[in-house]
Amino acid sequence: MKTLTLIGAGTAAILLATGAMAQDREGWPASFTVGTASQGGTFFVYGSGWANLVAEELGLTGAGEVTGGPMQNMALVHNGDLAFGLTTLGPAAESIAGTNPIAPGLAMDNVCAMFPMYQTPFHMAALSSQGITTLSEIPDGTVIGFGPAGSSADTYFPLMLEALGVSYERRNGGWDDLGGQLQDGLIDAIGFAAGVPIPTVSQLEVQTEISVVGFTDEELAVVTENFPVAAYAVSADTYRSLDEDLSSVAMWNFAIANCDLPESFVYEATRIAMEDNARMMNVHSSAAESLPEHWDKNNVLMWHPGAARWFNENGGASIAADMIHGG
């Protein structure tokens, strides 16, 4: 009789736990997709890896999706075509203001912040034979690839070069494709904005001789005064082509969620990214900056209630109610 009582209690406990889980998962999708960018870029590696972690731990189907990058991710997440995405705060601010070129005039305000990822440095790669050592001295007519249309590189790097007085021919494409064009001599240089090390740059270093070009002090002064970026040093051990730290500028990247997603779902997806940095570092080394303490780098997006709850309860954050969607 005692045995039967114990079994009954255990069964009741299991039923209670199952009921609680079902209640907590109310409204959860059976599958989800993370908008990343082109293959060969850090967004694709980071977003796909994080999606796999979330899917595995929560028992869902999830994957990264190749997209045009931050601008398109803002549009896709806003419309609910994607649950999650990755963006850069500059393009995010433009999207909220209604100046996203994908949908001019549409304020993409149904996109919420989830967690800080890493900073995106801007730098250039060129064949060593081109002799390009500084951005300001790039010869007129140089053909430069800037990644997919609407990417952070495509949005800001051309404007930076114009501010530095550079005249160039513009090309767009995925990072892997542009890397192949550079090797084949179809373009002269690539202007990158992605978490380091950028897979395409690392691959180029193995296959040919390249120069990785940053910003001089004078160029830094011009760019930081005119664009929403801050000075950033790319460590010398990032690329084989560097003998010393590379002077650059950078913007912060954040993971984003559709604001209508259930609070408990976004809480769990945020927890998985933030509670074990070593696991995220296994996805991509840029996740070294994916730390809860960087929550305060977001001054653009409203926070998803689930993400805000995780940071306020576990990340030492103090996200105010007026910065939380629906708060």
Segments from the language model and where they lie:
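Bacterial N-terminal signal peptides
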Residues: 8-15
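Pocket-lining segment of extracytoplasmic ligand-binding domains
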Residues: 89-91, 98-102, 130, 166-261
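Ligand-binding clefts/hinges and TM-proximal coupling segments of bilobed small-molecule sensing domains
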Residues: 140-156, 227-299
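Sec/Tat signal peptide C-region and signal peptidase I cleavage site
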Residues: 18-22
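Bilobed "Venus flytrap"/periplasmic-binding protein-like clamshell domains
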Residues: 29-57, 61-62, 120-184, 278, ...
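An extracytoplasmic/periplasmic, membrane-proximal ligand-sensing/linker region
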Residues: 29-30, 177, 184, 194-208, ...
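Bacterial N-terminal signal peptides that target proteins for export
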Residues: 1-8
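N-terminal segment of the mature folded domain
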Residues: 78-114
